């Protein structure tokens, strides 16, 4: 496990096999971007949580990942209280409503003089669920206390760089993480009278 303590090495979102059961210590320090829901808009709290869980699982590779809970909460909170824009996408064959939520969370944490966008490239993640496609475009900054670092300095979160390195491939092969996670969450039941 010394590969996670190298100096001048970016520790990114850890793969699912690095679970240590310390979900409470995982913190999203900063996040910015937008969530686009194309199709059925989530209206109830249950639907917003359902959409958030699917999107978070698609980003971190499963619901067992240490940062799954905090990411789900962040997305659900933005869908519930964040600013919203709704428009119709006329560029498709079947025009579907497109709802956009602005994700913005920040604390007074300064790594260096460089702003967040210079450190972490924009990533796009997309997942399809019942009647909708959810896409997040943005960047995250996580605390490093859950990835085996010596100190609590923040590390960059993303899915490039580390996942393409030889060290990651060796660890991935050793832990046999080639199997894809097939995640299914129960869709919330519709309430009301059927016509």
From Swiss-Prot:
InterPro entries for this protein: Rhabdo_matrix (IPR005060)
A matching Pfam family: Rhabdo_matrix
A GO term, aspect molecular function: structural constituent of virion
GO cellular component, as recorded: host cell cytoplasm; virion component
Keywords assigned by UniProt, alphabetized: Host cytoplasm, Viral matrix protein, Virion
Disulfide bonds: none
Compartments it resides in: Virion; Host cytoplasm
Source organism, top-level taxon: Viruses
Functional summary from the UniProt entry: The M protein has a crucial role in virus assembly and interacts with the RNP complex as well as with the viral membrane.
Family: Belongs to the novirhabdovirus matrix protein family.
Subunit structure: Homomultimer.
Protein name per Swiss-Prot or TrEMBL: Matrix protein
Native source organism of the sequence: Infectious hematopoietic necrosis virus (strain Oregon69) (IHNV)
């Amino acid at each position: 496990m010394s590969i996670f303590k190298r100096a001048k090495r970016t520790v990114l979102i850890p793969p699912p096999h690095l679970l240590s059961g310390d979900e409470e210590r995982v913190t999203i320090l900063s996040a910015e971007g937008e969530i686009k829901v194309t199709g059925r808009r989530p209206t109830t709290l249950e639907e917003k949580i359902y959409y958030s869980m699917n999107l978070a699982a698609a980003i971190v590779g499963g619901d067992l990942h240490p940062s799954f809970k905090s990411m789900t909460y962040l997305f659900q909170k933005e869908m519930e209280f964040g600013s919203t824009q709704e428009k119709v996408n006329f560029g498709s064959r079947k025009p579907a409503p497109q709802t956009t939520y602005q994700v913005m969370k920040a604390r007074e944490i300064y790594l260096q003089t460089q702003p967040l966008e210079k450190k972490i490239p924009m990533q796009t993640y997309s997942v399809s669920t019942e009647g909708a496609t959810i896409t997040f475009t943005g960047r995250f900054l996580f605390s490093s206390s859950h990835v085996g670092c010596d100190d609590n300095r923040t590390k960059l979160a993303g899915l490039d760089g580390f996942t393409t390195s030889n060290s990651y491939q060796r660890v991935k092969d050793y832990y046999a993480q080639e199997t894809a996670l097939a995640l299914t969450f129960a869709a919330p039941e519709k309430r009301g009278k059927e016509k």
